[in-house]
Amino acid sequence: LLADPGLPNKISSGQEHLIRPCIYCYVCVSQIFINKPMMCAVNSQLGNEFRNEKIIFSTARQKNILVVGAGPSGMEAARLLAMQGHHVEIWEKDKDIGGTVRVATLAYEPNGQLIQYLQNSLKELKVTIKKNTLATIEKIESFQPDHVIVAVGATRDAPPIAGKELNHVFDGEQLRGLLFGSDVEAIKKLSIFQQLILKIGRASQLLRNV
């Protein structure tokens, strides 16, 4: 109920696919030990209900909004804006949505449930998600949005340590690219056998749970 206070109503109305899932991160519990108000990693409104504020923009005029990045932040921003009546479109440069949460899902499956919920919600709100779409200046100008929300996530660059350029050394960004198959240069650092294993893993979904 902390993650989604509407859970009982969604169950009774047959909308289980729109229930925001608890990912069991225990942020809510940890707040007690530091004497802080209750909060939730997947429900930013928890503890702030009394504010009763409209988030981001009002709907006095429907706006055309572009969200760059289909990770959890971008998808949640799109969901809130669409709920307020705006026309929202998401562009994602990769062929899959979810951002780095896809990596987190490999180790902890409940993380993937959050992405599935967001995807279900956006489908219900008729938000378009364009994959394999790089947000260039030319494309953005052609789209003519009223607002652009940049939710492309962080970069994971290696510190200036001697040897980081060696073929057996990968920084966080390169490892992410290997998992998603999006970093051609990182893949070139692998041996033929390693590249084969990577392809087999992706083909059999061993490296993709979202």
Language model features with spans:
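Flavin-dependent oxidoreductase catalytic cores
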Residues: L1-V68, P72, A77-M83, H87-V88, ...
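Rossmann-like dinucleotide/flavin-binding elements
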Residues: Q62-I90, K130-Q144, V152-G163, Q174-V210
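Glycine-rich "HGGG/HGxG" loop immediately N-terminal to the catalytic nucleophile
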Residues: G99-T100, G181
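N-terminal Rossmann-like dinucleotide/flavin-binding domain of flavoprotein oxidoreductases
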Residues: V101-F143
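N-terminal Rossmann-like NAD(P) cofactor-binding module of classical short-chain dehydrogenase/reductase
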Residues: I149
